[in-house]
UniProtKB/Swiss-Prot annotation:
GO terms for cellular component: ribonucleoprotein complex; ribosome. It comes from Actinobacillus pleuropneumoniae serotype 5b (strain L20). This is Large ribosomal subunit protein bL20. GO terms for biological process: ribosomal large subunit assembly; translation. Belongs to the bacterial ribosomal protein bL20 family.
Length: 117
């Protein structure tokens, strides 16, 4: 049976991992063993945080809507309930955008929600 030399494959694999670890601190960007673990962990964090990002943005939108609604004399939960009763189907992302950039339109939405309650 012929001897299999794997130098080329190993070098390519190491190069790939070290390229992925570029910019990491200290040995994490230079030593293959440490870099491999760092890249694996980074992948785990990325996977987890892609899901967390969705939650965090929703939290941010709700906080912004709540702040704007309270300035207009209504709590967040009552505001959302009023919008649902008034059949206004605007999602939280757009509501937060309106709350930040168009105060007059948001005040009109609050009045519509108040009248539906």
């Amino acid at each position: 049976m012929a001897r299999v030399k794997r130098g080329v494959i190993a070098r390519a694999r190491h190069k790939k991992v070290l390229k992925a670890a570029k910019g990491y601190y200290g040995a994490r960007s230079r030593v293959y063993r440490v870099a491999f673990q760092a890249v694996i962990k980074a992948g785990q964090y990325a996977y987890r945080d892609r899901r967390q990002r969705k939650r965090q943005f929703r939290q941010l939108w709700i906080a912004r809507i709540n702040a704007a609604a309270r300035q207009n004399g209504l709590s967040y939960s009552k505001f959302i309930n009023g919008l649902k009763k008034a059949s206004v189907e605007i999602d939280r992302k757009i509501l937060a955008d309106i709350a930040v950039f168009d105060k007059v339109a948001f005040a009109a939405l609050v009045e519509k929600a108040k009248s539906a309650l």
